[in-house]
Amino acid sequence: MDDNYLDSIFEKYLHAKKIFKNKEVLRHSYTPRELPHRREQIENLAHILVPVLRGETPSNVFVYGKTGTGKTVTIKFVTEELKKISQKYNVPVDVIYVNCEIVDTQYRVLANIVNHFREESGVEVPLVGWPTDEVYSKLKAVIDAKERFVIIVLDEIDKLIKKSGDDILYSLTRINTELHRAKVSIIGISNDLKFKDYLDPRVLSSLSEEEVVFPPYDANQLRDILMQRAKDAFNEGVLDDGVVPLCAALAAREHGDARRALDLLRVAGEIAEREGASKVTERHVWKAQEKIEQDTMEEVIKTLPLHSKVLLYAIVLLDENGELPANTGDVYSVYKSLCDHIDLEPLTQRRVSDLINELDMLGIINAKVVSKGRYGRTKEIRLNVTPYKVKNIYRHDHQLQTVLTISMSRQRRLL
């Protein structure tokens, strides 16, 4: 392949009709100037945090709602506004945002908070290696170095609690009793209301001093959000009239997920740009929907536990053998043989039945209970993804290299 060929490709895409004015406006990380349909939540949060401006410690807040209901962007919006107005009143405020999906251990959360003040304190905690008690002592020291209010936002707090327990919350919600100059307030954000069941009652009462609920958006509200972003994201006249309503309607089916709506609009624009189209049409939205679903399914399969991956491969082998739909017993038999083949201790049939239900809930397989008349009821299992897709994902998973070498004969012997 010569350089001229590549040059011509780059030139072609560079000089194609420009769809986007500012694509970043459609990213999840972008904080807009206005937040449609979240005035009630903004006012609630402002009311909870306003004591800061009077020199008083605000309550801890627990914020919850499903994915894409505007929790994170609203918290960022309100805390950024608080920081601006606090300067006017000469009240020092620090806001520390921690994504607990990534920073998911007690040690790393504490280190993250300490390192927020590294330029001021000269203290930097490594990602591993120090005793946790020492990190906590450093945290208290750097926060309490001067009079100020520190608001710690723990986003996806449920991920942290499920992985590492609630000791860190116990410490942070009581830290003010150990400080002399600074005051700390916690904002916990969760997609999962049930996660409160994991908390010690004392932690729960401290964290949930105030609660703010974010309900799902409906299709009309999603349309307003997209219209607002589209003005800044796209060049004038490039969106067909039906594009935004379709993105909103599709995302409304996904429990009113604004993130999904923004992704649909962005990916539809990217597809149109790649095609060299002068406009984004509804056809591009449907293509975007298909691409996002494929990407989501790939991510779901990649993050399955090992036994679920082996179980899925058993169903793949049955599919390649022309034996789907299969019942639970047939699937378990092949799964057990695979485990024996790769020296993995098999789970019980009852546990595998639970894993089948989980794969069904994730949409990777379809496990439908059907009546066989006088023979009773049985579960018929089918694949919802192609064997090629599963194998392609497994090809990059070092744990499953051995599994990929296995095929199955018509007599269900593994080869």
From Swiss-Prot:
Involved in regulation of DNA replication. Belongs to the CDC6/cdc18 family. This is ORC1-type DNA replication protein. The lineage of its organism: Archaea, Methanobacteriati, Methanobacteriota, Thermococci, Thermococcales. InterPro entries: AAA+_ATPase (IPR003593), AAA_16 (IPR041664), Cdc6_C (IPR015163), Cdc6_lid (IPR055237), ORC1/CDC6 (IPR050311), Orc1/Cdc6_arc (IPR014277), P-loop_NTPase (IPR027417), WH-like_DNA-bd_sf (IPR036388). The gene is cdc6. One of its GO terms (molecular function) is ATP hydrolysis activity. HAMAP family: ORC1_type_DNA_replic_protein. Gene3D superfamilies: 1.10.8.60, P-loop containing nucleotide triphosphate hydrolases (3.40.50.300), Winged helix-like DNA-binding domain superfamily/Winged helix DNA-binding domain (1.10.10.10). One of its GO terms (biological process) is DNA replication. Keywords: ATP-binding, DNA replication, Nucleotide-binding. Pfam families: AAA_16, Cdc6_C, Cdc6_lid. ATP binds at residues 69-73, 217, 229. PANTHER family: CELL DIVISION CONTROL PROTEIN 6-RELATED (PTHR10763), ORC1-TYPE DNA REPLICATION PROTEIN (PTHR10763:SF22). It comes from Thermococcus onnurineus (strain NA1).
